[in-house]
């Protein structure tokens, strides 16, 4: 078949006679099988230029003819390794190739010399195409499948045009025109068996973009039969070639194909071919003209996207618990937990906030309250409205913090894990333009030099803001020196405490600052601020808080936090659902007492029966007193106010046989019985009377 093309170059035969002659001519089986995989160039290079082709692509090289003119052939697997003659050499005269001889460029149009130059020269803006082709902005130019197209627009494009064009008369012999090499006609393409139908605009866009004139035949049905036979014979050859894609892994990263081996382990959806010579079979979700438009679908089964040198590992690149749907994490909102995580897909802020609010309002187990207070449920709000003020528990937070968890989740560094973090490096939060206090304005300073006085202490800390130095029994002692080497700094502004914390050095979870005295220079002293978030801790938020199951713990060391008190009591008696540290309503510093609420009566009775508890935690080891917490606004449990005129009951019997509030009349009546005459009533003393702190809802 190739000898006929070369020996009949001087004389032109009619097109129908060429097709009839090709159908009658017997072809060896090897020639037919090599036909689809050996596309012919539209130009005939010189003999010395074709010498490198068999060495680099031996599988695609046909038997070399004996004539001086040889047809250039390229490998179907490596479109990037196309060997075409330099553009400076004038090509010899061409003739229209027969449909049986002009084979399809298979997966890309870069196999022909003219089309390859069009890709290389016209893909980048500002460079004039060498071959005279022109790119239209309004038509997608599917030059190579990696630039946004699929295989269907290229395979069988010319053959589709043959069926739509009426058969013209036999072409007359035309003289060769060596002066017009840019108008070289590409080889005729034949339809791929894998793509029986073509997109309606594929041929229009390709023809308009490149201005190539299809090679028309007088017998399209005959050419279709030849094309179908050749394509069917090439099925086994093409499939065997793609099955050996692992062996040509190095060829994808050849100099003519610098982008082929890039990101082999990534998601093929992210692989966007941006370089010339990218390997065939790498799809791209972006259109070269309009990146927002995805390419049209195709029936072609693409070859493997990227050859991998090693098998993929089964472990995901994200943690498995990131996609849980039990609301146990805040990484992805509920709407996005069913699909893989995509860093380029920014979900809406509204969904994120609603998801965090829903997660924060779920029952808290072993979590701290944020510094402005816990995210309150409806039952929690009801309990605090009725009992929190009577119990003297100070909640230093506006109510809006409980409704919107934005500040708590984004600005609170220790939210959700405050039991393990000190929260000393957290900045002061702001809400609605108003600063929200995070620390008490009263700061403990320990390890002072023995010869330092009040004025020297004030001078050492005045740079952080206005303050007053105080220590226990200062007014009675009339001394200018702290008696036990420690003092309290009372700052006027909470921001001064934050500045002091920022200036300290942290070691083993403790803060230190160097202070000088007349005899000691730069002595490290311990700075111990009180974080307001350490005042309350919820062990089990699913249980209601019952003030009649709450105990009072006296003599609590001031460094002890609510979480530590809850852990100690839960370890001893179990059933702890809440623990709180009593703080001063003005300075919000611990007063040395705490309260623990239990979820069951057994734990409550066990705690009050012990009377004393040994608190041990880190450096703390102290024996404290435990007794029932007495409320002063309870009605008599015996008469319900009928005998006392509706007054509150002043007495509470802490004996396990009673555990009730009594008015004076009922107390005398009940405890006059045998076995109860030794019960002692508990009375709310004036000094221990709780203060009613109204909620700050705004």
From Swiss-Prot:
Protein's cellular compartments: Cytoplasm; Nucleus; Synapse; Cell projection, Dendrite
Gene: CPEB3
Keyword match Cytoplasm: yes
Function: Sequence-specific RNA-binding protein which acts as a translational repressor in the basal unstimulated state but, following neuronal stimulation, acts as a translational activator. In contrast to CPEB1, does not bind to the cytoplasmic polyadenylation element (CPE), a uridine-rich sequence element within the mRNA 3'-UTR, but binds to a U-rich loop within a stem-loop structure. Required for the consolidation and maintenance of hippocampal-based long term memory. In the basal state, binds to the mRNA 3'-UTR of the glutamate receptors GRIA2/GLUR2 mRNA and negatively regulates their translation.
Site (Required for RNA-binding activity): 444, 488
Subunit-level organization: Following synaptic activity, forms amyloid-like oligomers. Aggregation requires an intact actin cytoskeleton. Interacts with STAT5B; this inhibits STAT5B-mediated transcriptional activation. Interacts with E3 ubiquitin-protein ligase NEURL1; this leads to monoubiquitination and activation of CPEB3. Interacts with CAPN2; this leads to cleavage of CPEB3. Interacts (via C-terminal RNA-binding region) with TOB1; TOB1 also binds CNOT7/CAF1 and recruits it to CPEB3 to form a ternary complex. Interacts with SUMO-conjugating enzyme UBC9.
PTM: Activated by NEURL1-mediated monoubiquitination, resulting in the growth of new dendritic spines and increased levels of GRIA1 and GRIA2. NEURL1-mediated monoubiquitination facilitates synaptic plasticity and hippocampal-dependent memory storage.
Residue ranges with Polar residues bias: 29-44, 103-114
Positions of modified residues (Asymmetric dimethylarginine): 308
Species this protein is from: Homo sapiens (Human)
Low complexity compositional bias, start-end: 13-28, 186-208
Pfam families assigned: CEBP_ZZ, RRM_7
Recorded consequence of changing residue 528 to A: Does not impair RNA binding
Entry keyword set: Activator, Amyloid, Cell projection, Cytoplasm, Methylation, Nucleus, Phosphoprotein, Repeat, Repressor, RNA-binding, Synapse, Translation regulation, Ubl conjugation
Occurrences of domain RRM (ranges): 441-532, 549-631
Feature type site, description Cleavage: 441-442
Effect of residue 488 to A: Reduced RNA binding
GO CC annotations on file: apical dendrite; CCR4-NOT complex; cytoplasm; cytosol; dendrite; midbody; neuron projection; nucleoplasm
GO biological process: 3'-UTR-mediated mRNA destabilization; cellular response to amino acid stimulus; long-term memory; negative regulation of cytoplasmic translation; negative regulation of cytoplasmic translational elongation; negative regulation of transcription by RNA polymerase II; negative regulation of translation; positive regulation of dendritic spine development
Chief place of localization: cytoplasm
Taxon lineage: Eukaryota, Metazoa, Chordata, Craniata, Vertebrata
Protein name, UniProt field: Cytoplasmic polyadenylation element-binding protein 3
Location of Phosphoserine modifications: 192, 195, 290
Biased composition (Basic and acidic residues): 1-11
Biased composition regions of type Pro residues, renumbered to the chain: 87-96, 165-185
